[in-house]
Design a protein with these regions (language model features):
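Glycan-recognition and processing domains
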Residues: 29-75, 189-191
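Sec-dependent, cleavable N-terminal signal peptides
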Residues: 1-31
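Short edge beta-strand/loop segments characteristic of extracellular beta-sandwich folds
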Residues: 83, 96-100
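Exposed low-complexity, polar/acidic, P/S/T/G-rich flexible segments that act as propeptides
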Residues: 166-191
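Noncatalytic modules at the cell exterior or secretory-pathway interfaces
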Residues: 147-169
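Extracellular carbohydrate recognition and processing domains
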Residues: 122-150
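Extended extracellular/luminal ectodomain segments enriched in beta-structured repeat modules
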Residues: 77, 86-94
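Extended, low-complexity, turn-rich repeat/linker tracts enriched in Gly/Pro/Ser/Thr and Asp/Glu
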Residues: 88-90, 99-109, 118-119, 167-171
Length: 191
């Protein structure tokens, strides 16, 4: 019995010894898989949001979900909003919205807006719509771009992507959004 216990301990020790390099490699990433140097000038970053991250601005706007998409089940004069969470001073270059527009009559329009902290005023920065897209049940994309579209001033404004549904059902569905942006030099200089 002692021999079996000793043999079992030896086998366990060997297995642990073989597993340790594998476990430690989880923490040590090779240089090729690490994020690029944040101090690189002109580096373009991207932040991706799922459709489920859009929020109804009113409880009157009811909605359903399908996969990662969100769609209206009622159409009051209310909107879905995706609040942007990017660093102060970030320059938004492109906002790409992933959506489904399978309605032959109505187009979808999406807005990039700024608003004051008190939510008393807002301003439209850019708009994109689906008028140039074919009707399709497949996920498609529309984009707003500029050089930059906007430089974020989080001290005095909030920023969001806004969509006001005009029909109900999955023929119009938000699936996600991706923002491409650069960071200000002051953030890049941090250790």
């Amino acid at each position: 019995m002692k021999r079996i216990a000793v043999a079992l301990l030896v086998v366990v020790a060997i297995l642990i010894g073989q597993a340790l390099p594998k476990i430690s490699s989880l923490w040590a990433q090779p240089a090729a898989s690490r994020a690029p140097d944040a101090t690189a000038s002109g580096q373009i970053y991207a932040k991706t949001y799922g459709g489920y991250e859009f929020r109804a601005l009113s409880s009157d706007l009811t909605y359903g979900t399908q996969g990662t998409g969100i769609y209206a089940t009622s159409v009051p004069i209310k909107s879905f909003r995706l609040a942007l969470s990017l660093p102060n001073g970030a320059q938004v270059l492109t906002a790409t919205i992933f959506l489904v527009d399978n309605d032959p009559v109505n187009n979808m329009a999406v807005h990039l807006i700024s608003y004051t902290a008190s939510l008393t005023t807002s301003a439209n920065i850019a708009t994109a719509d689906t008028s140039a897209l074919p009707n399709s049940p497949a996920v498609q994309s529309i984009s707003m771009s500029g050089s930059p579209l906007v430089t974020l001033d989080n001290n005095s404004h909030g920023y969001a992507i806004l969509y006001q549904p005009i029909i109900t059902g999955t023929a119009h569905m938000l699936v996600g959004a991706r923002l491409e942006y650069t960071l200000p030099t002051s953030i890049l200089a941090l250790p």
